[in-house]
Amino acid sequence: MQNQLNALLQSAKKSVADAQSEIVLEEIRVDYLGKKGKLTELLKSVGQMPADQRPLLGKAVNEIKREIQQLLNAKSTQLREKSLQEKLNKEKVDITLRGRYDHLGAIHPISRVSERVSQLFSMLGFQIAEGPEIENEYYNFEALNIPADHPARTMADTFYFSGDKLLRTHTSPVQIREMEKQGVPIRLIALGRVYRRDLDQTHTPMFHQVEGLVIDKRSTFANLKGLLQQFLNCFFEKDVRLRFRPSYFPFTEPSAEVDIYQPRTDKWLEVLGCGMVHPNVLRNLNIDPDEYSGFAFGIGLDRLAMLRYEVTDLRLFFENDLRFLGQFK
């Protein structure tokens, strides 16, 4: 019996050592330690032995069983560690390799233009102000000398909420708020999103605008013309031809629209509106128009982006087509 046990142990050791997977290891366990396993069969035969030998043989069988189980456990741990190491080796990353840059994003062209405009006006001594996009009728219209019967105040042109709340149609309300807060003299620009009921090749219901304001005791229309010429020359990085046409805005008097000459098409394209601040706007803020004067201007940032990047349809900027936006990396 002892010889059989020793032979069985050696056979089990060899089988366990040769096992290369958990599945094979489980088959070995069943073959030796299962209900019908080799060691179980030997244990059954102990009852046929002389009574004085049974305790010793039973003890020997249990020791062999315990040793085989230990072999199985050790081999199982070894196989799991080997499997884990192989998996880690497959997933290993060489941190010295160059990264992939194929899908890096880029600053949106409207954001590029906005940053450029802010930078240029900061260099010209303007402070940059912001204000709420949801406004009331006083700041958006009344304080700017826009009467109640003006077409811009109709539902056809303006997005209204309940009461007197609306989506601002320009960034001029920021100028009113800043003059209330700071007083005069003042020199600022206000950039941001504005909203109007309009949609075609050169207009969208939401667009971006920068409006500038200068109020002091010596401002003239000549100062306004010189400032706009200098700004546009710097923005387009070349000398541009401008044309000032008489126009009408409720908040400026006199008023003008400014066109820029396009040599490629031999045409003039409107880029902004401007004028001297209307005395009524100053009076609304308790500023004496006999002592102070100033000028204001409004420029569509989207229109500037169209000109700078030679884009013919304004709506392309807002359609999130990566084929289009990828050109501006």
Curated annotation (Swiss-Prot):
Gene name in the database record: pheS
Annotated protein name in UniProt: Phenylalanine--tRNA ligase alpha subunit
Pfam family, one: tRNA-synt_2d
Biological process terms in GO annotation: phenylalanyl-tRNA aminoacylation
This protein's UniProt keywords: Aminoacyl-tRNA synthetase, ATP-binding, Cytoplasm, Ligase, Magnesium, Metal-binding, Nucleotide-binding, Protein biosynthesis
Cofactor binding mode and count: Binds 2 magnesium ions per tetramer.
Subcellular location: Cytoplasm
PROSITE patterns: AA_TRNA_LIGASE_II
Organism: Coxiella burnetii (strain CbuK_Q154) (Coxiella burnetii (strain Q154))
Family in the record: Belongs to the class-II aminoacyl-tRNA synthetase family. Phe-tRNA synthetase alpha subunit type 1 subfamily.
Uppermost EC category: ligase
Assigned GO CC terms: cytoplasm
Residues binding Mg(2+): 253
